[in-house]
Amino acid sequence: DYYRHVYNGKHDVYRGTVGQPFTEHHATGTYSSDLFADAAIDFITRHQTKQPWFCYLPFNAPHSPNRKNKLPKQANEWQAPPAAFARYGMSEKEADPKRRYMATVTALDDAIGRVLDCLDEQGATDNTFIFCFSDNGAFRLNREGIDMGSNEPLRGGGVTCWEGGLRVAAIASFPGVIAAGSIVDQPLWSPDLMITYANLTDAQPPRIRLDGKDALPVLSGRAPSKHQAFYFEFRKHAALRLGDWKIVRTKPDEPWQLFELKGDPSETDDQSAANPEKLADLIHEFKSWQTEF
């Protein structure tokens, strides 16, 4: 719930500092995207020093509404502040899920805009690396007509290991390093961000095996992605990508399917029978990764 800050029936907003226990942050009635943006703006304003800083800003919108997060008799619908509805001439009682979703995304866009405006006001934009992405593809579970996003032409969606669940767009900005308007068609994944920010801030990452690689050489167009393989498991789903090839299964006891993503990004043409050697190579790579975990 974007106003009560409840997830799975429990309060899910906390405030904590280093060396102190995390405590619940009760801001009932404040829209979550605004709450998170306010916290980020406060952090940025307080950290305008010569020391590097890092701000992780995980908005929860537009995550799908869920009845488990609602009060009895409360409608299971997209939520947005009044101004977001008014932008399109709608009332807060708008019944069309698609239009309510539009208001939710608009409110998120406004919140992000306020954070970016703060960077401008602090004179920090030109020396700040910004990376914005989704944690998964749009949900396509057809729940009560509220799943609005589209992953076309990719197969599947959030909480699956099909490309529609794994492959998401991202927006990056770093003036003087990443060319404005440039498009990067190279595979990266979220573990890359830890290494990237550590390198930018001269922080020392843990001396353990890390799966991330610095993303800036790729985003700036100076080098291709160094990734050879990507490993995924979520609940019963599993997948591994090696170059342009990918294996995927939706249950541990079912056979793997094999797809060549460059020519078949929609994962419609299973190549497992036609390419048994390639299938065996990817299964071997998957087991190697699985052993490490």
Please give the residue ranges for each predicted region:
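Active-site-proximal cap/lid insertion segments
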Residues: 1-191, 198-209, 249-255, 262-268, ...
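Short Gly/Pro-enriched turn/cap motifs at secondary-structure boundaries
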Residues: 158-163, 229-231, 237-238
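Charged (Asp/Glu and Lys/Arg) segments that form or flank catalytic channels of large polymer-
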Residues: 215
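Short acidic-hydrophobic surface loop/beta-edge motif
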Residues: 13, 238-242
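Short catalytic/ligand-gating loop segments at beta-alpha or beta-beta junctions
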Residues: 209-212, 228-232
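Short solvent-exposed loop/turn micro-motifs enriched in small/polar/acidic residues
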Residues: 5-6, 231-233
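Basic phosphate/pyrophosphate-binding loop/patch that engages nucleotide-derived ligands
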Residues: 120, 220-225
